[in-house]
Amino acid sequence: MFEKQKRVGLVVYLYYNRDARKVHKYGDVYYHSKKGRYLVMYVNQNDLEEKMKELQKLKFVKEAVASAFDEIDHQFVGNLHREAN
């Protein structure tokens, strides 16, 4: 049966927008900001390190950053009254 894969967001900063098509083979591109020259894409979590290394080796990629969505607190109720850690 089908098993759900854990996905992670990845932000890829480019030097030029014309190179955005070349990144499509590394994962599922969700958003392309032409003004900011970056792509938001999703890759499988078990392939994250490998994909980041491959992307950072490319000449047209300025930087590849993994999303910190899993690391932040998702309990928004009462954030103002909670003590800072």
Swiss-Prot record:
Subcellular location: Cytoplasm
Cellular component, GO annotation: cytoplasm
Keyword match Cytoplasm: yes
Pfam families the UniProt entry points to: DUF2129 (PF09902)
Organism superkingdom: Bacteria
The entry's keywords: Cytoplasm
Coiled coil: none
HAMAP family: UPF0298
Family: Belongs to the UPF0298 family.
Listed name of the protein: UPF0298 protein SUB0431
Organism in which the protein naturally occurs: Streptococcus uberis (strain ATCC BAA-854 / 0140J)
